[in-house]
Amino acid sequence: MWARDKCSVPQLEMDSRYTSATGIGDLNQLSAAIPATRVEVSVSCRNLLDRDTFSKSDPICVLYTQAVGNKEWREFGRTEVIDNTLNPDFVRKFILDYFFEERENLRFDLYDVDSKSPNLSKHDFLGQVFCTLGEIVGSQGSRLEKPIVGIPGRKCGTIILTAEELNCCRDAVLMQFCANKLDKKDFFGKSDPFLVFYRSNEDGSFTICHKTEVVKNTLNPVWQAFKISVRALCNGDYDRTIKVEVYDWDRDGSHDFIGEFTTSYRELARGQSQFNVYEVVNPKKKGKKKKYTNSGTVTLLSFLVETEVSFLDYIKGGTQINFTVAIDFTASNGNPAQPTSLHYMNPYQLNAYGMALKAVGEIVQDYDSDKMFPALGFGAKLPPDGRISHEFALNGNPQNPYCDGIEGVMEAYYRSLKSVQLYGPTNFAPVINHVARYASSVKDGSQYFVLLIVTDGVISDMAQTKESIVNASKLPMSIIIVGVGPAEFDAMVELDGDDVRVSSRGKYAERDIVQFVPFRDYIDRSGNHILSMARLAKDVLAEIPEQFLSYMRARGIKPSPAPPPYTPPTHVLQTQI
């Protein structure tokens, strides 16, 4: 590092000097690359089985996890042993990565420790509990109580699991950089420099995490300040290497490499000082030229840490996610009695509609306390008079379209297939407006609505659907569209406002609330449907937390205070194995 060069800091204006940099990585994928937040899971038990003759049990808790699409359980970690108690409050916590969009299966096994052997078969089994991380997080106050099971005919007590988001995962930093005397790369002018930031991974590879704007025609650029989460920058590891590459922007995308330097969060946190002036080095030049020193310097101008309100703060404060499904019953799906139909009920495996419902629903249900889900259909003729409907209850009860859990939704779907006649057209607006009516009545942040539409075809009411989406973008709701079958889904891509915000009659959507994916992109070639469903859920749900937060921020809604944390009585002696 070099003694600080002075950077003049002009008033930044949004003019022709600034251009977005493209071609180095795909910034649309940055959000997907950001690691999960991390939560600390605490374990307590009450009324464990007493396996010791002359004293109480000496319990330990062992956590097992399952990889996505894999049935094998792997040991994740163990608590300490607490001597002589049936009501342990374990001190050692389990720290887990948390993804809203993934089903993270957990198994907690309890043992009475009888010796110092680490082999669990040498100790008495006290029972076990199965749950998901989403279940713990989604419970009131992120505190889940479940009965311990596993020993037939015996009451094994209760486990109490609490989840707390780690503070380092909630921080974001606002940083600004400038550079001095960068190499001139353009023949007829000065360089057009921009910075690309990468965080290092545990395997030594690097993942792009931020790209600055381009400052045109200067060797002494001052970039605009930018905000990035600590998770994205270094995954919460303050000593992890951060690599910064400096490029000269070219219109054709073949940006010229100027040089690079490395730093870490801990170094950057020192702020503006001689420690945060970096030599920009081009390794090729350094290897070829003996007199080469550097290709300029980059200086940190400011570094400010902010603690942000997170998705989990709202969930812990009691916000409920209300999940509604809407299924396409148009004739283009094919006769449900024929194996070629997308609605065919194969007794041995789920059809594409069933897989989409189950994949998304099984994750979202963890955030809904009553587990009652409205299930709607559209595009069918209904008995007894053949009336065409684009908003009918799958359970046949328009006054109460709620189904009990995802299994209840599946049952209502299968029953509907036997009673309605597939027809058309493919109209989305009625089901979007149905959910919007409920969402419009909730203005305090206590509920957020997610609508899953599963469809096979080309949308018929595009203008009305766009208008419905623009109106819904002001409400606490998100829309997931899963396209099944071989159709072209160009119109659906238009509704997914990642590139161009949806508009209707000159009005643009207030925020992007639609996520579309074609199911065929997720079918596992080996026939592993569990893996197909996990991949689908991961992609369609990944944007929900940010869409949720964008609504809450825009409305200035703060999370409700979480219920007081459970404070166990202090007691007992602790040992470890």
From Swiss-Prot:
Q: Residues that bind Ca(2+) 2, according to the entry?
A: 52, 112, 114, 124
Q: Pfam families recorded for this chain? A: C2, Copine
Cofactor, how bound (note) = Binds 3 Ca(2+) ions per C2 domain.
**Record-annotated residues binding Ca(2+) 3?**
114, 117, 122, 124
Q: Which UniProt keywords apply?
A: Calcium, Metal-binding, Phosphoprotein, Repeat
Q: Where does Ca(2+) 4 bind?
A: 186, 192, 248, 250
Record's InterPro entries?
C2_dom (IPR000008), C2_domain_sf (IPR035892), C2B_Copine (IPR037768), Copine (IPR045052), Copine_C (IPR010734), VWF_A (IPR002035), vWFA_dom_sf (IPR036465)
Highest rank taxon of the organism = Eukaryota
Example GO molecular function: calcium-dependent phospholipid binding
Family in the record: Belongs to the copine family.
Protein name per its UniProtKB record: Copine-8
The lineage is: Eukaryota, Metazoa, Chordata, Craniata, Vertebrata
